[in-house]
């Protein structure tokens, strides 16, 4: 948000999450811009956004994207790989390692939509869930897939100049 009379302020994740969680618990959703590349290729920092909501009664499951805080106080949006009892094991879509265990109370919100290049994509649609599961299953070959995708994009960029 910018413009005449508007001041842009950077607020730490710890401050905004403690302020926003009570609002999410009342049924509101929050649209947040993304930073970083850990969720590439689905989500790209500086370009895409996520719409998050309260976890509520339905606990997040494999394939869901959740907002969590790690032991160092770092907040991130990552996908659930699996759940054991009350611990979550997460990873970013471009990562090769699984993070966890992440305690249930460290999982703060769940993504209900992603906004990719301005287009809204529901995280509850069957096609989205299918893609998410495929990407989870592709874990052993993901580095190769991402390498080929980068090379292909670079090649297309060179020939289209």
Segments (PLM) and residue ranges:
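Extended hydrophobic leader/signal-anchor segments used for secretion and membrane insertion
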Residues: 1-161
């Amino acid at each position: 948000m910018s413009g005449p009379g508007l001041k842009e302020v950077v607020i730490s994740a710890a401050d905004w999450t403690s302020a926003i969680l009570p609002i999410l618990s009342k049924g509101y959703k929050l649209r947040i811009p993304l930073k970083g590349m850990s969720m590439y290729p689905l989500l790209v920092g500086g370009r895409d956004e996520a719409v998050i909501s309260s976890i509520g009664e339905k606990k997040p499951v494999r394939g869901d994207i959740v907002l969590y805080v790690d032991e160092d106080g770092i907040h991130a949006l990552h996908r659930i790989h699996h759940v054991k009892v009350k611990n979550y094991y997460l990873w970013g879509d471009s990562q090769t390692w699984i993070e966890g265990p992440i305690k249930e109370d460290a999982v703060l919100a769940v993504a209900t939509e992603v906004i990719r290049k301005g287009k809204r994509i529901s995280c509850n649609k069957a096609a989205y869930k299918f893609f998410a599961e495929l990407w989870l299953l592709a874990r052993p070959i993901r580095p190769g897939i991402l390498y080929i995708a980068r090379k292909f994009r670079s090649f297309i960029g060179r020939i289209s100049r």
